[in-house]
């Protein structure tokens, strides 16, 4: 039996001479005694331990109290209820799979040696070995989690041999499925599923003629000499994992706390290294540092101190488990606070060469993690006083109700192999889109959701197509000053992102089978398959008395009846699409008032832009007709489907000044004093004094000239006899679009599909500007007269916020 209660496996090393495997059990009665809360104070890290771990002395060495043990027992039971501990059968299965994989790489090393001219006897002595790292090595893996593995080979076996010869062996193995190679990754990797267990396999070439059979760890820095940079990066995973286990004072307590922290990060939507949050290693380093500061504390105390410390941590002050070891002139680069001062949240790995494990963190993701630290600190304080439970800490996030606007990125492919490559490539580049969006004026935050979704909404039209969707929440920072500029141009952010995607697509053998579509959507337009990812949005209800005085049945409150008067006019999202056909939509809206009647026709046009493997150079710039936006006074009612509420928040983003309108007796809305828009970024409780919020409506139009013709906002607010303003609802009037004809205004509405052939043959009616197609999205809100105003003069309406996205061809 190994240290964790599982059987040892021959020929499998896990980079440690003291711990050879990391397995846990599922049921509480099956947990090994070393992980039992009742034995936490008797294991490594007792109160008389003189060793000081870390770069500073501990904050407290006090032993756990009886309350700490009680809370730790409750924590353990909560983690078991989330099925975080795998069964002994699955643990044995993992060990068996690792044994098979180890035997495969040994045989592969022999074959490569024979092919390169080594004698039979010498080739038989040349071995390759498998090491584990990551969550499996740390002992915090759960059912269905993957195993991070490292293959170490001698100096004559190249990385090309690993990705060619070994790949050929693995892909035809009967127990291996979903085989994929990612050669151009930061750390080149082979991913596969071996008998139902996901495995990531990387390779490192050591400067040795043969790998010793007795090699059990890779801590010795001599292994880093005379090897390539990719091998150093590959070795770093095992070396960091070993160092973490050596630098924590109590391994069982560390594991229990880390399991909770990882589950919390996943459920709160902040677990993803590739998208700018933190990965498993970074969360382990943060937890290990708290264990150093409180070496004798129980897991429940460690978790509370975790949030308490990082709630007030002054980023970018680095997190260090040990002092950084400087490298020589010719040695590998080591993290330097002066050279790497642009890093926002440095968490430094303890093994030489020290690196920042969080270089992908962005302004938006850091802000969200900070708010989650604050939330966690508040809840854990209440857990200690009995006001909350551990399940309150582990509640799902409200990402899909938190923001008013989202970007949806759909990745299309025609087979599983292409889907894994295409989806992985796009996901790995989303951080560049985030960075570009953050640098856009008026953009405050662009927050990704760290998970892709299988999207089957297209199956009716193309059942063979595979689609994965990613989402980002957007927050804008508009000024409340009347007349202030409220336009946002996302041209650069989007075109640079699509350019990176197309560059890779051109290198693929079948680029025509892989598409991407980007949509800018409102919260109420989110697809149904994301609804299970968080708490349901509350539905406001009201009781209306009948003419007899009896209360009628409860129903959804209409928008026109809401106290905050969220005026909505559903529009279609802007899309950049490959090989899709838009539908024709001709909605007509008629708005009547007591003083005038206005009829407006709305045209919504979707542009379809193919992204092909070869660039086009003869694309003429489209033209644009003037688009008029008229805002008539309206007494029309809004359907209950538009009654979307905004989740509570403590982080507000000043936007335009929306109205706070009350319904009149005839059904129209009268406005009160304007208030600022709150766009939620956290799930914290709202300010109880704030009782009004607004929904920014999105309107998509396709302008067809590049002349100085702009949309006009006509304020038709009507003043009632009592001096209050009557709420008006915007109506969009858009011209028809034909890319092959001169643009003229028309009263009919049409939808044009812009194909690659049409773009190439379109006449040039204006000077080409970057050879792009322009899609303009208008976010409209109204300005109202304060009900307390002494005069009937209305204030100048603020400029409408417009978000322009220019898609490259």
From Swiss-Prot:
Keyword Metal-binding appears in the UniProt entry: yes
Stretch forming the signal peptide: none
Subcellular locations according to the entry: Nucleus
Listed GO CC annotations: mRNA cleavage and polyadenylation specificity factor complex; nucleus
Keywords (A to Z) from UniProt: ATP-binding, Magnesium, Manganese, Metal-binding, mRNA processing, Nucleotide-binding, Nucleus, RNA-binding, Transferase
Low complexity bias locations: 12-25, 572-655, 666-706, 736-760, 785-794
Record's catalysed reaction(s): RNA(n) + ATP = RNA(n)-3'-adenine ribonucleotide + diphosphate
Chain positions recorded as ATP binding sites: 133-135, 146-148, 200, 262, 271, 280-281
Binding of Mg(2+) 1, residues: 146, 148
Region of interest called Disordered, as start-end residue ranges on this chain: 1-50, 529-760, 785-809
One of the protein's GO biological processes: mRNA processing
Known cofactor(s): Mg(2+); Mn(2+)
Entry's EC annotation: 2.7.7.19
GO MF annotations, alphabetized: ATP binding; metal ion binding; poly(A) RNA polymerase activity; RNA binding
Cofactor, how bound (note): Binds 2 magnesium ions. Also active with manganese.
Family classification: Belongs to the poly(A) polymerase family.
Function: Polymerase that creates the 3'-poly(A) tail of mRNA's. May acquire specificity through interaction with a cleavage and polyadenylation factor.
PANTHER family in UniProt: POLY A POLYMERASE, POLYNUCLEOTIDE ADENYLYLTRANSFERASE
Listed name of the protein: Poly(A) polymerase
Organism: Dictyostelium discoideum
Gene (name only): papA
């Amino acid at each position: 039996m190994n240290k964790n209660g599982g059987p040892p496996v021959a020929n499998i090393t896990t980079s440690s001479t003291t711990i050879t495997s990391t397995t846990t059990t599922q049921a509480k009665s099956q947990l090994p005694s070393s992980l039992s809360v009742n034995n936490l104070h008797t294991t490594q890290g007792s109160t008389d331990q003189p060793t000081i771990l870390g770069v500073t002395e501990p904050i407290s060495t006090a032993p756990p109290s009886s309350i700490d043990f009680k809370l730790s027992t409750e924590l353990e039971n909560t983690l078991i209820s989330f099925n975080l501990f795998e069964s002994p059968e699955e643990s044995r299965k993992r060990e068996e799979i690792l044994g098979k994989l180890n035997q495969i790489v040994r045989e592969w090393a022999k074959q490569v040696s024979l092919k390169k001219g080594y004698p039979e006897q010498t080739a038989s002595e040349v071995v390759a070995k498998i090491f584990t790292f990551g969550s499996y090595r740390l002992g915090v893996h759960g059912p269905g989690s993957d195993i991070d593995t490292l293959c170490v080979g001698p100096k004559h076996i190249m990385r090309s041999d690993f990705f060619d010869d070994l790949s050929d062996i693995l892909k035809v193995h009967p127990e291996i499925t979903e085989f994929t190679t990612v050669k151009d990754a930061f750390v080149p990797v082979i991913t596969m599923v071996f008998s139902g267990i996901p495995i990531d396999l990387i390779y490192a070439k050591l400067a040795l003629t043969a790998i010793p059979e007795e090699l059990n760890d890779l801590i010795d820095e001599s292994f880093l000499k005379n090897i390539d940079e990719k091998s150093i990066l590959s070795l770093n995973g095992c070396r960091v994992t070993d160092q973490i286990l050596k630098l924590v004072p109590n391994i069982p307590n560390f594991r229990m706390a880390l399991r909770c922290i990882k589950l919390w990060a996943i459920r709160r939507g902040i677990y993803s290294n590739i998208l700018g949050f933190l990965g498993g290693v970074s969360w382990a380093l943060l937890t290990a540092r708290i264990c150093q500061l409180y070496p004798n504390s129980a897991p429940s105390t460690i978790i509370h101190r975790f949030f308490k410390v990082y709630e007030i941590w002054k980023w970018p002050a680095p997190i260090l488990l040990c002092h950084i070891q400087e490298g020589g002139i010719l040695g590998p680069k080591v993290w330097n606070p002066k050279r790497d001062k642009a890093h926002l949240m440095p968490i430094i790995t303890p093994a030489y060469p020290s690196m920042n494990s969080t270089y992908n963190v962005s302004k938006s993701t850091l802000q969200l993690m900070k708010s989650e630290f604050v939330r966690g600190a508040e809840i854990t304080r209440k857990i200690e006083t009995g006001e909350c439970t551990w399940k309150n800490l582990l509640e799902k996030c409200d990402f899909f109700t938190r923001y008013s606007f989202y970007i949806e990125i759909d990745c299309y492919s025609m087979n599983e192999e292409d889907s894994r490559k295409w989806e992985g490539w796009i996901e790995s580049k989303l951080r560049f889109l985030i960075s570009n969006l953050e640098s856009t004026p008026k953009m405050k935050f662009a927050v990704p959701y760290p998970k892709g979704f299988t999207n089957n909404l297209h199956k009716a039209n193309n059942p063979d197509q595979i689609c994965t969707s990613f989402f980002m929440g957007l927050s804008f920072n508009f000024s409340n000053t009347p007349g202030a500029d409220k336009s946002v141009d996302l041209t650069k952010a989007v075109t640079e992102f699509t350019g990176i995607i197309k560059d890779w697509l051109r290198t693929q053998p079948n680029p025509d089978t892989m598409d991407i579509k980007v949509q800018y959507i409102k919260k109420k337009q989110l697809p149904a398959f994301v609804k299970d990812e968080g708490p349901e949005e509350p539905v406001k209800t009201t009781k209306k008395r009948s003419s007899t005085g009896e209360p009628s049945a409860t129903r959804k409150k209409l928008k026109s009846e809401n106290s905050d008067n969220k005026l909505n006019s559903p529009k279609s999202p802007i899309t950049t699409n490959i090989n899709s056909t838009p539908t024709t939509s001709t909605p007509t809206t008629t708005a009547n008032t007591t003083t005038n009647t206005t009829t407006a026709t709305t045209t919504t046009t979707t542009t379809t832009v193919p992204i092909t493997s070869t660039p086009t150079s003869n694309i003429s710039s489209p033209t644009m007709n003037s688009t008029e936006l008229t805002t008539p006074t309206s007494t029309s009612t809004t359907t209950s489907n538009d009654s979307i509420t905004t989740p509570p928040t403590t982080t507000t983003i000043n936007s335009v000044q929306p109205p706070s309108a009350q319904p009149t007796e005839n059904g129209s809305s009268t406005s009160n004093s304007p208030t600022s828009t709150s766009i939620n970024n956290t799930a914290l409780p709202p300010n109880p004094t704030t009782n009004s919020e607004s929904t920014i409506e999105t309107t998509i139009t396709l302008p067809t000239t590049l002349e100085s013709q702009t949309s006009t906002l006509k304020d038709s607010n009507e003043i009632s006899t009592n001096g209050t303003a009557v709420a008006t609802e915007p109506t969009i009037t858009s011209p028809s679009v034909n890319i092959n004809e001169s643009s003229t205004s028309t009263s009919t509405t049409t939808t044009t599909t812009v194909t690659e052939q049409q773009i190439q043959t379109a006449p040039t009616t204006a000077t080409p500007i970057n050879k792009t197609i322009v899609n303009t999205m208008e976010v409209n809100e109204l300005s109202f007269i304060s009900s307390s105003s002494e005069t009937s003069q209305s204030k100048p309406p603020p400029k409408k916020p417009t978000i322009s996205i220019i898609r490259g061809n």
